[in-house]
């Protein structure tokens, strides 16, 4: 799922299209969504895929004017009998004009 936001007069507004200055949040994106965003913003799709790989470690990586900040974020799973805590990767990709955030799940 892709959500696009733009700040206007101090308010965060949801948008239909990617535009300069927008924040693009990708939650469990499929390959088509990854391809669309990466093609439009000229971002290497591997940076997005790294944010979806549960085995990735936290790091900062720079490539062709784009910066990936990869951190582990906590998640809570409850199976009805017990509560489990773990971490999943959360990617922040900075381009010249946009911010892309990527995660396997919705994290509140």
Regions found by a protein language model. Give the residues of each.
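Peripheral, non-transmembrane regulatory/ligand-interaction domains of membrane transport proteins
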Residues: 1-108
């Amino acid at each position: 799922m892709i959500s696009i936001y733009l700040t206007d007069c101090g308010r965060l507004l949801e948008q239909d299209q990617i535009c300069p200055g927008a924040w693009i949040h990708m939650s469990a994106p499929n390959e088509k969504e990854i391809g669309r965003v990466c093609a439009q913003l000229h971002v290497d799709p591997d940076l997005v895929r790294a944010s979806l790989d549960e085995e990735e470690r936290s790091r900062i990586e720079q490539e062709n004017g784009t910066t990936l900040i990869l951190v582990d974020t906590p998640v809570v799973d409850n199976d009805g009998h017990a509560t489990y805590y773990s971490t999943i990767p959360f990617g922040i990709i900075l381009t010249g004009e946009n911010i892309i955030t990527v995660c396997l799940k919705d994290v509140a």
